[in-house]
């Protein structure tokens, strides 16, 4: 069995354990428990963000959405460490924060450049403090940005 098939089987088994009425859906509240049971460890904020993204108003998640979410989350789990490592270059004080203007200059002028508009759009909903962004917020923004997917 291919790794993807094994992973999908694991997701399905965990999902089915919480699908008590066997209707192919779990509640948003159970989502974090199911995610943790397959090796993911989402924070409460991540769970809130995920719920906003995938809840169609019913408060339920079907297996297709769950599987897609987990596949995407696992795909980016390695890159999260890479993003955090790259962020350290900008974290001059070692306190987990970087200057947004330094990030903007680099991301719009080096490598696979973003336009200034793409950068501004990417950070428009980011939580910042005094022109600084925290590493965890930066990771969240990068992972959810269409510019990096």
Swiss-Prot record:
Disulfide bonds: none
Keywords per UniProt: Calcium, Metal-binding, Repeat, Vacuole
InterPro entries: CALM/Myosin/TropC-like (IPR050230), EF-hand-dom_pair (IPR011992), EF_Hand_1_Ca_BS (IPR018247), EF_hand_dom (IPR002048)
One GO CC annotation: cytoplasm
Cited Pfam families: EF-hand_7
Residues the entry annotates as binding Ca(2+): 19, 21, 23, 25, 30
Entries under SMART domains matching the protein: EFh
Location of the protein in the cell: Contractile vacuole
A GO molecular-function descriptor: calcium ion binding
Highest rank taxon of the organism: Eukaryota
SUPFAM superfamilies: EF-hand
Domain EF-hand: 6-41, 42-76, 78-113, 113-148
Subcellular location, principal: other
A GO biological-process term: microtubule cytoskeleton organization
UniProt similarity note: Belongs to the calmodulin family.
Its job: Mediates the control of a large number of enzymes, ion channels and other proteins by Ca(2+) ions. Among the enzymes to be stimulated by the calmodulin-Ca(2+) complex are a number of protein kinases and phosphatases.
Entry protein name: Calmodulin-like protein
């Amino acid at each position: 069995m291919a790794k993807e098939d094994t992973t999908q089987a694991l997701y399905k088994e965990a999902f089915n354990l919480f699908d008590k009425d066997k209707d192919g859906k779990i509640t948003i509240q159970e989502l974090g428990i199911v995610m943790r049971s397959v090796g993911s460890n989402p924070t409460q904020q991540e769970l809130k963000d995920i719920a906003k993204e995938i809840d169609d108003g019913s408060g339920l998640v079907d297996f297709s959405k769950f599987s897609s979410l987990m596949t995407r989350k696992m795909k980016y789990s390695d890159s999260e460490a890479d993003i955090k490592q790259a962020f350290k270059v900008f974290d001059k004080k070692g306190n987990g924060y970087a200057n947004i203007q330094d990030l903007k200059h680099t991301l719009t002028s080096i490598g696979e450049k973003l336009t200034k508009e793409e950068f501004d759009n990417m950070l428009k909903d980011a939580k910042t403090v005094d022109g600084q962004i925290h590493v965890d917020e930066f990771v969240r923004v990068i992972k959810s940005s269409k510019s990096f997917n």
